[in-house]
A protein has these predicted regions:
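Conserved HGGG/HGGXW glycine-rich cap/lid loop of the alpha/beta-hydrolase fold
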Residues: 2-50
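Gly/Ala-rich beta-loop-alpha elbow adjacent to hydrolase catalytic centers
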Residues: 80-89
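Flexible "cap/lid" loop of the alpha/beta hydrolase fold
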Residues: 91-131
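Conserved alpha/beta-hydrolase catalytic His-Asp/Glu region
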Residues: 114-116, 131-185
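Conserved serine/cysteine hydrolase catalytic core
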Residues: 169-210, 229
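Catalytic histidine-centered segment of alpha/beta-hydrolase-like enzymes
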Residues: 223-237
Length: 257
């Protein structure tokens, strides 16, 4: 993995797990509004690190824990997981220790897809992500709901480093069709599973609610996959601060709690 950090180590820490097809730097637009108050850690999965081999979620979690200890992090105020980053964040939070006082899952989290469909998806996902590098971001609109110039560099960097083997190994232990990881009731009460009302992954919401009955399940009305984070990083950062400092979501007209 590769790690970036922003802010003062003496401040409460926020750990970000990034989405599929991008690097950890994709959280930088949000972190820009947090780094004065929080110590922000942005790991990039080995899937998107040149010369590294993805060995599974357990190994990824181990690398994150080693880095946090080396940085002297004693408190994780918040863990933020975007899209498929939820699979890694879930494994991280299920471990004892620095699991995070609050967690915010943004979009498409904990999707359940069988092994057969995942095998079929593999070559298409690989070509889609690599095409973003080959086309310098020109194919983004074909695989995502937007083609904002601000996010293209993160897709391009990820596509450059991606290998077929790493993506195959990641999908083999992510998006599993099976029982979700258990979370204690108290942890669920401080966990937010957010969905955009018009994103394709909204169909997984009922299964997540059933698995974590004590959690929080805000719906971002008329929002696409990770739209608030991409289009309004300052607003998204302010929302994260509200979760940390007040243990609640802010009152926003498009959020249905």
């Amino acid at each position: 993995m590769i790690f970036e950090t922003f802010g003062n180590k003496q401040n409460p820490a926020i750990l970000f797990f990034h989405a599929m097809g991008v690097t950890g730097a994709s959280s930088e637009p949000v972190v820009r509004y947090l780094q004065d108050r929080y110590f922000c850690i942005l790991p990039t999965s080995t899937v998107y690190c040149a010369g590294q081999k993805y060995r599974g979620k357990t190994d990824e979690v181990r690398q994150v824990e080693v880095f946090l200890r080396a940085q002297g992090v004693e408190r994780l105020a918040l863990v933020v997981a975007s899209s498929i980053g939820a699979a890694l964040a879930g494994a991280f939070r299920a471990q004892p220790g620095l699991s995070g006082e609050h967690v915010f899952f943004d979009g498409g989290q904990l999707a359940q897809i069988g092994k057969g469909p995942r095998r079929i998806m593999m070559p298409f996902l690989y070509l889609a992500i690599k095409s973003l590098y080959w086309s310098r971001g020109g194919t983004l609109k074909k695989i995502l709901w937007c083609e904002d110039a601000a996010i293209k560099p993160y897709f391009i960097a990820a596509g450059k480093a991606l290998t077929y083997g790493n993506l195959r190994r990641q999908l083999s232990d992510s998006l599993e069709e099976g029982a979700f990881l258990m979370l204690p009731e108290e942890l669920q009460r401080h966990t937010y599973f957010a969905f955009g009302s018009i994103e394709e992954h909204f169909k997984y919401r009922d299964a997540v609610i059933k698995a974590y009955p004590y959690g929080n399940f805000p719906v971002f009305e008329e929002h696409q996959h990770m739209q608030y984070q991409i289009r309004d990083p300052k607003g998204f950062a302010d929302m994260l601060c509200c979760i940390i400092e007040e243990d609640r979501l802010p009152e926003l007209p498009f959020i249905r709690k």
